[in-house]
Swiss-Prot record:
Protein name, as recorded: Putative ferric-chelate reductase 1 homolog
Location, primary (coarse class): membrane
Source organism of the structure: Drosophila melanogaster (Fruit fly)
Domain DOMON, first and last residues per copy: 245-368
EC number: 1.-.-.-
Amino acid sequence: MMQALTMRSWLATLVTALLAVAIWPDPGQSLPQGAPETVCDTMLPFHSGGSVLPQNSVSPFSVETSSSTLGQGQTLRVDLTGVPAGLSFGGYMIQARNRNPPHQIIGQFGPARDGTIKLMNCENSVNNSATHSNAGPKQQVILEWQSPVDFLGQVVFNATIAQSYNEFWVGVPSQPVQIVRRDLSAAPPLPTQSPSAPAGTTRAPYVPPSYVAPNNVVAVSSDPIYNGCGQSKNCFGFPDGCVATKSCTSITVVTVRGDVFEFEIQSGKGTNAAYVAVGLSDDAKMGDDLTTECVPENGRVNLYSSLTSASPYSAVRSNVNQNSARLLDASIVDGVIYCRVQRDAVTNVQGRTFDLRNGKYHLLVASGSSLKENSVGYHDIGRLPSAQPINLAEVQDLSGSSRLLIQLHGAFMIAAWIGTTSLGIIFARYFKQTWVGSQSCGTDQWFAWHRLLMVTTWSLTVAAYVLIWVELKQAVWHAHSIIGLITVILCFIQPIGALFRPGPNDKKRPYFNWGHWLGGNLAHILGIVTIFFSVKLPKAELPEWMDWILVSFVVVHVLVHLIFSIGGMASERHLSQRANTFQMGDMSHHQQHAMRNGMSMERKMDAPYAGMRKGLLGVYGVVLILFVTVLILLVVLAPIEQFLGKS
């Protein structure tokens, strides 16, 4: 009898052990029936009795919502996916929580038709959380979530996602979703209210701090992004000085807490920005800058890191570690882009090290209205670098870098080589037989004007050359600078050569005339070519269509030369016909003497068609002033797109 009992006991133990092994979860799988309601508060899996801890690395999974704004009582699509797409996971748990205290669970999830979603009742409410109904591998989960009818404010979806039994991430957040009145979806969000359903005590370790993006009916002065500027955080935006007036077209805010570097970036209202970005630069010039871009795509704001290139302008994302920055918060409300980003203290990009703890950097704020494939477009809305490099941890008032010297350099060179040089050459070539007998400062009119215009060219060129050296503080070699240097050298040679001009009857005078003509025209041509090359310089920020204005000027200038040349030939023919009217051999001595006296008198008179030359000179002068004015305005107001966009 005792032996039979012992045998039954042994069999019972064996069966129990076998059953235990059969139902014991596979270490490579999540819990087959989903998360229990005992973890509603923590969302922390109790795998292997709690001995398996959540991963502390960046989650390879994301929580995406179909919209960043939702009306009360409306339905929202929520997607759980891997990054990159196709990465599978086994289990999950998700719930939406109020961004503001008390961080209670908000809304309800809808059941799946195929039964793949298990709904949970947390905090004495129904279906306000969801988990998996089976632990099989899945690449995407699509859920439907309905907002309460009595809640206004922002919610964040938090998820726990398990790739395997031993690998899971807790607190994977979505971007904030703004719950607004259903009948007034564009109205400003009211102070956050709790829904009527009772709320238990909850924790919120993974819910980002509160930030409500501004909208077009909230006063600019109430925008919280400006709070603490210059006191607890660095703020910089454009146009220059906009932080003080709280009216920035784009702004970045830098907050440093130990080794934590947070950047807030926001576009302005009514700018129609396609992106907003901030760069870290050693020299305040475009090129080799670490850039953080916030780009709205498919109803959500995405974060990208890139390295800029100066010529041609580009912001390249390849070979830049996209995990060097993490998106903590983002929204787009009424066209205003906002994101809050945490960057690593040290980032290595293509052999360059950006050390935010020890380095000093210029802040470059930029925004534009267009995107390229895998890149942002040109910053036509605006761009501004800070005047001085700063240690990001040192809070201070920042001002924009001045472009005055660059603008003066460009304006002086345009006035010199498009304006005064063009007119000076016209006087020297076509007006030696005009205003004959009239003098200024003891010299013929044509020479007085030619000398005045060329001295002005020399003065403007020297001043512009000095200004750009003061700005750059170093030699920069590219087509614009090399051809420009040759032009400056020729500009110096011309007046020096003029000091050694041979006399009118000197046998060397023709050689001087040809050399002076060649040097002057070569300098003029190279000066205009140099201006063409300036259009492509990123620091100039000139529009590409400025090339067509320059081409138009060249066409007009060549056409004027052609008309003057034809007029000159007609004048010479007229004089020749008058001289050949009588044959000298048929004249008496008295007649020949009278003829010579008549020709001598003609030399003291203007050549034929002087009125035409004067009239054409007046028209050309007016057109030249218009060209110079337009080109200087493009330089001084660069980038001109920001003004054209406001008109």
